[in-house]
From Swiss-Prot:
Binding site for pyridoxal 5'-phosphate: G138, S139, D278
Protein name: Probable gamma-aminobutyrate transaminase 4
Intracellular or extracellular location(s): Cytoplasm
Residue numbers binding substrate: Y171, K307
Cited InterPro entries: Aminotrans_3 (IPR005814), Aminotrans_3_PPA_site (IPR049704), PyrdxlP-dep_Trfase (IPR015424), PyrdxlP-dep_Trfase_major (IPR015421), PyrdxlP-dep_Trfase_small (IPR015422)
Enzymatic reactions: 4-aminobutanoate + pyruvate = succinate semialdehyde + L-alanine; 4-aminobutanoate + glyoxylate = succinate semialdehyde + glycine
EC number: 2.6.1.96
Length: 483
């Protein structure tokens, strides 16, 4: 759904394009199933059983009926190495046979967790990092970031320095803290969120929010000034951290305008505010660099990782902590007797073994280099179809990440009625042709596995073009009915 101000919201899809349940739903045991499904409305389950994916192979997935789909969203922007990488399966199997689980509490741990922490510190080169804390997801990583920041400021005798600044349209997860950080109203509605410790500043979407005649650099300057004014209004002594994705991902694939991060970093540094970079989507090659911080010259104090960390073969997330922060945490834990934060599965040996092998593959195969090699074909192919479409307002992307936003007359302000479900229509047209995309209201996003070939990109682009034409025809019908 798109609000009058253009803020993207998660939606359950168009009512008119759901496929009614059939006999196969009973056969496969999915009709009236027992799951409380994430980001799914009850009516969807009632009229349409879930699409059950049974197996994967490379960039493709297969449902229980044997239908093959090109997975143009890599699971949820996560299966970077595709769905059948034998080295990851082998790493998991060997670790399961050797040591399926042991914890990392009370000065105990396992070899895979130690090795993975060392490898992550080595791999992240945007600035020096000191320690790694393991979680099970990106949501947990961002949730833990806030606790670490609070702990750090308490240790320094700054109990008032607790508020976190995030951005509208951002997505940082769905736990209490990470959903509060997220700038999407749907994640807050009737969950009594966001928490009072979160402040939201401007979304850096130039196309939608720039003033008439304003250049990208001028837009970035205005947003940096707005951030500084927010800090001064609240009091710099109350602001602990600023969190941002290098490219806003699940909130609509929003790229930073020119000079944005240069100016934002100058502001937060001026007021002794920590910079948390959320690399959950952009980490490990998605943008054509190993990390988004490399592409946009971000020098963070803390980094959140997940998704491609294990190519989603096993649940795992991580936080990279700067030496300055980790030194304070160590000193304060000595004073208190412990650093009392962690999860049963922090540093799970199987997840760490899989992630360690994934990192080796990223380096050995130069996955960021491959992304750079094929990204132009991907970006230009999609944009060529979108440029001539009367229903596409903007197509934006970098590397193997792209979004198409549907608006009328190519205007950011002439929005299609939500009930038309234009994005969902496009998504269904893709699915009919054997391709999965991510639908977010009147926007669709694509983020294929990073191993995608030029031939597979050509197929993806071809399906995109066919689906776009079919969607244009459907929108024309809806317009004629409206008139």
């Amino acid at each position: 759904m798109t609000t009058p101000h253009g803020l993207l919201q998660y939606s359950s899809g168009a009512f008119s394009d759901q496929v009614p349940a059939d006999d196969s739903a009973e056969e496969h045991g999915v009709k009236d199933h027992a799951m409380l499904a994430p980001f799914t409305a009850a009516w969807q389950t009632a009229i349409s059983p879930p699409l059950v994916i049974e197996r994967s192979e490379g960039c493709y997935v297969y449902d229980v009926n044997g239908t093959k789909y090109l997975d143009a969203l890599a699971g949820l922007l996560s299966t970077a190495l595709g769905g059948s990488e034998p080295r990851l399966v082998k790493a998991a199997t060997e670790q399961l046979n050797k040591l399926p689980f042991y914890h990392s509490f009370w000065n105990h741990t396992t070899r895979p967790s130690l090795d993975l922490a060392k490898e992550l510190i080595s791999m992240f080169t945007a600035r020096e990092m000191g320690k790694v804390f393991f979680t099970n997801s990106g949501s947990e990583a961002n949730d833990s970031q806030v606790k670490i920041v609070w702990y750090y400021n308490n240790a320094l005798g700054r109990p008032k320095k607790k508020n976190i600044i995030s951005r509208t349209q951002s997505y940082h997860g769905t736990t209490f803290i990470s959903a509060s950080l997220s700038g999407l109203p749907t994640l807050h509605q009737d969950f009594d969120l966001p928490g009072r410790f979160v402040l939201h500043t401007d979304c850096p979407h130039y196309w939608r929010f720039h003033l008439p005649g304003e250049t990208e650099e001028e837009f970035a300057t205005r947003l940096a000034d707005n951030l500084e004014n927010l800090i001064l209004k609240q009091g710099p002594e109350t602001i602990a951290a600023f969190i941002a994705e290098p490219v806003i991902g699940a909130g609509g694939v929003i790229l930073p305008p020119k000079t944005y991060f240069e100016k934002i970093q100058a502001v937060v540094k001026k007021y002794d505010i920590l910079f948390i970079v959320d690399e959950v989507i952009t980490g490990f090659g998605r943008l054509g660099t190993m990390f988004g911080s490399d592409l946009y010259n971000i020098k963070p104090d803390l980094v959140s990782l997940a998704k491609a960390l294990s190519s989603a073969y096993a649940p795992i997330g991580a936080i990279l902590v700067s030496p300055e922060i980790s030194d304070v945490i160590h000193s304060h834990s000595n004073k208190l007797g412990t650093f009392a934060h962690g999860f049963t599965y922090s540093g799970h040996p199987v997840s760490c073994a899989v992630a360690l092998e994934a990192l080796k593959i990223y380096r050995e195969r130069d996955i960021p280099g491959h992304v750079t090699h094929v990204a132009q074909r991907f970006q230009e192919g999609i944009k060529a179809f979108a440029a001539g479409s009367p229903i596409v307002g903007e197509t934006r992307g970098v590397g193997l990440l792209i979004a198409t936003e549907f608006t009328d007359n190519k205007s950011p302000y002439e929005l299609f009625p939500f009930e038309w479900g234009v994005g969902e229509i496009f998504g269904q047209e893709c699915k009919k042709r054997g391709m999965m995309v991510k639908v977010l209201g009147n926007l669709i996003a694509m983020s294929p596995p990073l191993i995608i070939t030029r031939e597979e990109i050509d197929k993806l682009v071809s399906i995109y073009g066919e689906a776009l034409k079919a969607t244009e025809e459907r929108v024309a019908e809806l317009k004629s009915k409206k008139n």
